[in-house]
Amino acid sequence: MPSGGDQSPPPPPPPPAAAASDEEEEDDGEAEDAAPPAESPTPQIQQRFDELCSRLNMDEAARAEAWDSYRSMSESYTLEGNDLHWLACALYVACRKSVPTVSKGTVEGNYVSLTRILKCSEQSLIEFFNKMKKWEDMANLPPHFRERTERLERNFTVSAVIFKKYEPIFQDIFKYPQEEQPRQQRGRKQRRQPCTVSEIFHFCWVLFIYAKGNFPMISDDLVNSYHLLLCALDLVYGNALQCSNRKELVNPNFKGLSEDFHAKDSKPSSDPPCIIEKLCSLHDGLVLEAKGIKEHFWKPYIRKLYEKKLLKGKEENLTGFLEPGNFGESFKAINKAYEEYVLSVGNLDERIFLGEDAEEEIGTLSRCLNAGSGTETAERVQMKNILQQHFDKSKALRISTPLTGVRYIKENSPCVTPVSTATHSLSRLHTMLTGLRNAPSEKLEQILRTCSRDPTQAIANRLKEMFEIYSQHFQPDEDFSNCAKEIASKHFRFAEMLYYKVLESVIEQEQKRLGDMDLSGILEQDAFHRSLLACCLEVVTFSYKPPGNFPFITEIFDVPLYHFYKVIEVFIRAEDGLCREVVKHLNQIEEQILDHLAWKPESPLWEKIRDNENRVPTCEEVMPPQNLERADEICIAGSPLTPRRVTEVRADTGGLGRSITSPTTLYDRYSSPPASTTRRRLFVENDSPSDGGTPGRMPPQPLVNAVPVQNVSGETVSVTPVPGQTLVTMATATVTANNGQTVTIPVQGIANENGGITFFPVQVNVGGQAQAVTGSIQPLSAQALAGSLSSQQVTGTTLQVPGQVAIQQISPGGQQQKQGQSVTSSSNRPRKTSSLSLFFRKVYHLAAVRLRDLCAKLDISDELRKKIWTCFEFSIIQCPELMMDRHLDQLLMCAIYVMAKVTKEDKSFQNIMRCYRTQPQARSQVYRSVLIKGKRKRRNSGSSDSRSHQNSPTELNKDRTSRDSSPVMRSSSTLPVPQPSSAPPTPTRLTGANSDMEEEERGDLIQFYNNIYIKQIKTFAMKYSQANMDAPPLSPYPFVRTGSPRRIQLSQNHPVYISPHKNETMLSPREKIFYYFSNSPSKRLREINSMIRTGETPTKKRGILLEDGSESPAKRICPENHSALLRRLQDVANDRGSH
C-alpha cells in the first residue's frame, strides 16, 4: 500500500479469525469473501437428489429445472450446510413454477406438498423459511414469488399463534384428553361409537384451517382468523351438547354452560346455544367482530359444506355432524378436502401442529394435549422455545419499539399475547369511531364552507376515486369475491370515519396556530388528502392484520413516501385515542421512510434538493438551538459544516426569528419552497468545471428591474415589502444626481413572486453620503459591498427615498465564493419550517439517536462520537448521492469505522455490525446487500452538477478525494466468519426482472466502504487524524429529549391527559387546574378524583394541568430565570396547600 505520509491511515489489521469464533451470529451466515471456492455438485449430491425426487414422486420437468437451478447456484456460491436443504428450496421453486394452473380446479398430480418436501429433506419449517429467503436472493426470483413465500410464512405464523390460543380455549370448554377411558377394540359392525375429546380436538382444528384457507383475504389476518376460530369452537360446542355423551365431553366448570346442564333430567335444546359473547369475554375477543365473522363468513361457508356432503347432519340448524353415525364420514371428508386444497395451492399442511412429531417438523412447539405426564422434559421445553425464538427473530406479529421511542414506552409484558394485543388495538379503533359516520360532521362542514374555496365536493370525489382503486386490489377467487369486497368496503368505511375525524382535529389545530388565515390552499393539496387517507387505511389494516402491510397502501394510491411521512406526526398529534401499538407502528413507518425509502432514485426528495441549489441543509440550520449540544469544546464559527448564525427578520412576525419549539404547522409541511432558492440563482456565477461547482442556472426572463425614482422633491416614496418577500441588501448602483455628480451607492431591492428583483436606492444626498435608513434596514458599508451577497427577511419596514434620483446601472457586488465554502447568510438556507428542513431535522434526529446508541455499545468516547457525527453530516451535506438507494445505517457504520481508524481507536466492522444488530430496526440486508453500481435514472436538473448523476458516485467531487492510501478493509477481515450450516454469501450481481435496467451490482458493506465511501470521505476524515493539529471545528450534536413527546389521554370517558410539564413562561392563563408530581399535596389528587366523579370543578385557584407539553421534565421545578421572590412565593403557596 503506498505511503501517504502523516496523513495516511494505517493499513488494515489482519482478519480477526480468532475473534470470529467467539462471535455469536444471529443469522445463519454472512456474506463472506473468504468462504471456500464454489464447486460443481458431486456425484453423491446428485444421488441424494435422485433419491429425494423418487420419494416425492417428482415429475421430470420439475426435477430437471430444480437440478439445473441447484447446479447453477452451487457453481456461483458456496452453499454451506446440508445439501438436501438447498435441494429442497430448488424443488419447491420448480414445483411452483414449472406447472401452470390451467383451471381453478385442483391439480393433485402436479403439485407436491411442501410438508412432504420438508419431511423428505429432513428440514424443519423454520429452517426452510430461512434458507428460502437466501435462495430467492441468489436466484433473483421475481417479486410475486417472494410475496408468495412471505405470505406463506405469515400464514404459518398466524396459525402458530392461533394454535397456542386454541389449546387453552379448547381445554376451557372440553375435558382433558387424559381423563378419557381408552377405547376397546370392537368388531367391524360395532365401530360407530360416540366421538372422544381428542377426536373433537383434531376435527375442530382441521375444520378451522380448511375454512381459513378458503378465505384468502383473511387467512393472514390475525384478528379475523382468531374470530374464525371462536366460530369453529362455538359450532363444535353446540354440536357436542347434542351428543348423548355430552357430559363426557364438556368441561363441567365451563362458565358458558346453561344453569340446568348438571340436572339429571336436562335435555339439549333443538337449536344450539351461541357462546361467542362468552368466549370473547373470557379470551380477548371482540364481540361485534366475531359475530360479524360468524354471520357473514362462517355460517354461509358451513352451509356450503353441508351442501357438498362434506358435513353430514341437519343443515337447517348446522348440527348433527358429531353424532356417531355422521362423525366418522364427516371427519374423513373434511380431511380429504383439506389435503386436496393443500396440494392444489401449495400451502403448508397446518395439520402438522397436531402431529406427535410436530416439534421436529415445525422446529417448534409441543402440544399441551398429550397423553403423557403433565410435566415436560427438558428436551420438549427446549423444542417449545424454538418457535418463540423464530417470532423474536422475525419480529412476526409484533411491533418493536423504535429506538427513538424506547425512553417513552415500555416493551410489552411477557403475559401479553399477539392476539390480545391485536384485539386491544381493534377495540381502541372501535371506541374512537363510535358514533361517527363516513361523512363530515356538521362542525367540519361549517369549517369547510368558511374557506374561500369550499373543498367539500373535491374531498368527496377524491375519496370515491380512492375507494374504487382500493376495491380493485381485492379480487380473489370468484367464489369469494363478495366476501373480499365486503371486507374492503368495511375497512375503507372505517378509514373514512377516521379520516374525517382527524381532518377536523387538524384544521382546528391549524386555526389555533394561524388564526383567521384562509386554509383553502392547504385543503386543496391533493398530496395531503391522499396521504391522510392512506394513513387512516394503514391504521385500520394494522388493527386487523398486525404488523400491517406497508407500503402496499401507498403504492396502490401512488402516494410518494416523501409526502406520506409528513402526515404521520400530524395524524398522531391530532388523534389522542391511538393505542401504543398503532403509534409504534406509525413511528416505525416514519423511520423506514427517513432511513431509506425516501432516498430512492424516483423520490421527490431529490427534486427538493435540486430546488435548493443542490444543497442539503446542515443540522444546525434545521434544529432549534435548544436541541443542540453546546459543549465548550465545540466551536461553531468558521466551521465548513456549521456556518455562523445571522439574525433573521421575518416579514410575518415583525421581529427576530424565533426558535421553533411548537410543532410545525401543516401549512409549512405542504408549503412551496421558500423564495430564497430563486433569489440565490440570480447571483450564482458559472464555476469552471475543474472547481466542481454548480453552474448558475439563469432563467430566460429578466430578473433584475431598474426602477427610476424621479421628480419626488418634497415627497417621500415608501416601499414596504409584503410578508414573505425578501429585501436584498448587498448590491451597488451607479447613480447620477441632478448636479451631474456620479456616485456609487448601495441599493436595496425586493424579490417579487416571479423570481425577479426590483432595486431601490438607499436614502442619499448630492454629496454622496449615505444617510441612515428608517426602520431596521441598515446602510451598507464599503466592507459589505466588497463581501458576498446576502439578503434579509424584513417586515413592516418603510424605505424612504427623498429627492430626484435615477438608477443608471446596477452591478451586483461581491465575489463568487470558492467551492467548498458555505455561504453564511440566511438566504442560503431554507426556513426551519420548510418541508425540506423538516425532513432533514427528522433525519438528523434519527441518525443522532442511533449513533449515540451504537457509540455507547462500542464504548466510544464523547469526543470521538462528535467527530463521527461531523463526518456523517459531511457525507449527507457534501455527498448526498451516497444515500441514493442506500440506507442511513450504512453511512453511520462507515462513519464510525473511518473516524475510529484515523484517530487510532480502531473498531472493527465486525463489532460495529454486532452492536448494530441489537437495534430494533436492524436487518441483515442492510450490511449484506449494499448498492455498489447500477443504472439509475438521471435527475433532470438542467445542471452539470456531478451530484445529479446517479451512476458510480466514485466519479463525484474528485477534489475531495485523492490517490493516497485510504483506510480500506477486506471483507474477510471484518464480516463474521460463517458458522456451520450457515447461509451462502449474498449475491453481488443481480440481473433484475426489469429489462430496461442494466445489471445491478450489490455487495456487502465492506465492498461499499472500499469502493465507494472512502473515496468520497477520505480527504475530510484525515483532517481529524492525530497527526493533524489543525482539525476543523466539530458540528453540534443533537441531544435526546428527556420528556415524553406527546400527551396521553388517561381515560376515554374524561378529558384528562398527562404530558410533560411546561416552563412557567410558556403556560396559558391560570384558568385550569394544576397538579405537580412529587410536589403538590395528596389533597389535590382527591380534589381531582372528586371533580371527575361529580363533574364539578373545585373552587381553587390552583390545581392540575395535564395538556400538551414541550420538552421540560415532568417533575415540578421553578424556571432558572425566575426571580427569588417568585420562587419564595411558590414555596409559600405549596406549604399552605399541604395544610
Swiss-Prot record:
Pfam families: DUF3452, RB_A, RB_B
Gene3D superfamilies to which the protein is assigned, alphabetical: 1.10.472.140, Cyclin-like
Sections of the chain in a coiled coil: none
Annotated spans, Spacer: 617-827
Extent of Low complexity compositional bias: 810-827, 964-973
Role description: Key regulator of entry into cell division. Directly involved in heterochromatin formation by maintaining overall chromatin structure and, in particular, that of constitutive heterochromatin by stabilizing histone methylation. Recruits and targets histone methyltransferases KMT5B and KMT5C, leading to epigenetic transcriptional repression. Controls histone H4 'Lys-20' trimethylation. Probably acts as a transcription repressor by recruiting chromatin-modifying enzymes to promoters. Potent inhibitor of E2F-mediated trans-activation, associates preferentially with E2F5. Binds to cyclins A and E.
Keyword set, alphabetical order: Cell cycle, Chromatin regulator, Disease variant, DNA-binding, Glycoprotein, Host-virus interaction, Intellectual disability, Nucleus, Phosphoprotein, Repressor, Transcription, Transcription regulation, Tumor suppressor
Subunit structure: Interacts with AATF. Interacts with KMT5B, KMT5C and USP4. Component of the DREAM complex (also named LINC complex) at least composed of E2F4, E2F5, LIN9, LIN37, LIN52, LIN54, MYBL1, MYBL2, RBL1, RBL2, RBBP4, TFDP1 and TFDP2. The complex exists in quiescent cells where it represses cell cycle-dependent genes. It dissociates in S phase when LIN9, LIN37, LIN52 and LIN54 form a subcomplex that binds to MYBL2. Interacts with RINT1. Interacts with PML (isoform PML-1, isoform PML-2, isoform PML-3, isoform PML-4 and isoform PML-5). Interacts with RBBP9. Interacts with CD53.
Biased composition (Acidic residues): 21-33
Location of Phosphoserine modifications: 413, 639, 662, 672, 688, 948, 952, 966, 971-973, 981-982, 1035, 1068, 1080, 1112
Record organism: Homo sapiens (Human)
Changes after translation: During G0 and early G1 phase of the cell cycle, phosphorylated on Ser-639 and on 5 sites within the domain B. Phosphorylation on Ser-672 in G1 leads to its ubiquitin-dependent proteolysis.
Region (Pocket): 417-1024
Name of this chain's protein: Retinoblastoma-like protein 2
